Amino acid sequence: MSESKARSLPELDVEQLQAELRRVKYRRRFARSVLCILLVLALVAALAIAAAYLWLPVLRIHGDSMENTLLSGDVVVAVRGLEAEAGDLITFEVNGKLLVKRVIAKGGDVVSIDEDGVVSVNGAALDEPYVHEAALGTCDVQMPCVVPENTYFVMGDHRAVSVDSRSEAVGFIREDQTAGKVVLRIWPISRLEWLY
């Protein structure tokens, strides 16, 4: 019986054995390479998520308070830890919602808004080419007002509809309340641009 089994096995020469060995080694190498690539991709994805959460919040714009600078549906990237100056866009949380507004003034500045919606800081009218339309909007803050230290006075670019520092519902934004300085619009691709 054992003789017949031995006779039924094909005889392989050295070249065939070497070819089979190369094929098996190639399959192992290929499987290891695929596994390595998948692990690297998983690591890159985890790092990207951590970076987005810790340093680079990505936000989708809802509403029209920042028209024409930002439109509803735009996606922007903010950077945590950057100091904001007048004219910069920042994101901050109010009542559990992340908002994006423009910094108009910082701590110690005096802000006034006239009946026509012209904004002045420290007595000088601002040149605001980004404003959708000048309007006083909802304003229940006494003007002129002094911006408290370590806070920002913020406004939306579409003044007629924006709820911002002119309203006690939002008020002054503490520096530690900000989630980041908005630096880049990434969507839609046709409007990709730096925003600082």
What label would you give each PLM region?
Residues 2-32, 54-60, 68, 72-196:
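Soluble "head" domains of membrane/secretory-pathway proteins
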